[in-house]
Curated annotation (Swiss-Prot):
Name assigned to this protein: Quinol oxidase subunit 4
Reaction(s) catalysed (UniProt annotation): 2 a quinol + O2 = 2 a quinone + 2 H2O
Originating organism: Bacillus spizizenii (strain ATCC 23059 / NRRL B-14472 / W23) (Bacillus subtilis subsp. spizizenii)
Subcellular localization, as worded in the UniProt entry: Cell membrane
Family: Belongs to the cytochrome c oxidase bacterial subunit 4 family.
Membrane topology: Multi-pass membrane protein
Entry function: Catalyzes quinol oxidation with the concomitant reduction of oxygen to water. Major component for energy conversion during vegetative growth.
């Protein structure tokens, strides 16, 4: 019991360091967005990278993910969730970008061409 009270009475250095790193990452993202001459897509990728690092930092420093008995399982589940989210977002962007340029929607015909607008055998 005395061990737990001594454990809770120390200064929260881990939280201070996490907060300071979060501020630094936010200011770096602001600097990249405002003061660099990079292209918009490069800025976007860099800011997303900083956001991903900051999310991991928040989870590890403030959410105490690794401090329980099954901390490894929590980290694994979180990484799997991030992987699933990244696959869904990047897959959606890929599908939208790859199929937007086919041009089927530009000529007024339904996708697949005019030959598919009426199904054979269903004409009245």
């Amino acid at each position: 019991m005395a061990n737990k009270s001594a454990e809770h009475s120390h200064f929260p250095w881990k939280h201070i360091v996490g907060f300071a790193l979060s501020i630094v990452l936010t200011l770096l993202a602001l600097w990249v967005a405002v003061y660099t001459d990079l292209s918009s897509s490069a800025k976007l990728w860099i800011i997303f990278g900083f956001a991903f690092i900051q999310a991991a930092l928040q989870l590890l420093m403030f959410m105490h993910m690794t401090e329980s008995e099954n901390g490894g399982i929590q980290v694994g589940n979180t990484l799997f969730g991030f992987f699933g989210a990244i696959v869904i977002v990047l897959g959606s962007i890929w599908i939208f970008a790859a199929h937007y340029h086919h041009g089927d929607h530009m000529d007024g015909n339904p996708p697949g061409g005019a030959e598919h607008s009426e199904h054979s055998g269903h004409n009245e």
